[in-house]
Amino acid sequence: MCLHISDLGINAELIRHYEHSNFRGMFGYFLQSFPTLFKSNYPYKFTIEAKEHRYVKKGVLLAIANANKFGTGANVNPDGKLNDGKFEVLIFKRISLFHIIKTLFKNAEMDSNFVEAISIEEAIITCEKPIAFQIDGEFIGKRKKVEVKVADKRLRIAVPKDFVPAYN
């Protein structure tokens, strides 16, 4: 079960390296980015089977996002909504330091040459070979197939009486 963002590819590889590191925080991620970039076998080929469409895409990362941001604060899914019954499949086509830095700004628009977003209700995602997979920041292992759908029932969360949601 994923509440936030999961992905296949280079970010999951980064999380795998980070989990085995002695350094934590942003500095730890920065240090682990070097072995990740040099040891990963990207780009990867992804096949996304949705209800009425089939997509075959290449990229360095395929994210499954119901929320907007990674834990690092990178805003990778600015149009994502938690309450619309859909999630976004984000295919990051290449590594671009400029575009990665751009995601750290609140209202940054995503460049279609960098990332492609597909908004869907359910999907079966397959890869040619097992690829690193993470769920909500936890490395799960390598996977060739991932099945994704929005759960029918909502998760109940306790909030203060005076809580006002940020969206309607």
Q: What kind of feature is each model-predicted range?
A:
Residues M1-N168:
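Long C-terminal subdomains/extensions of small-metabolite kinases
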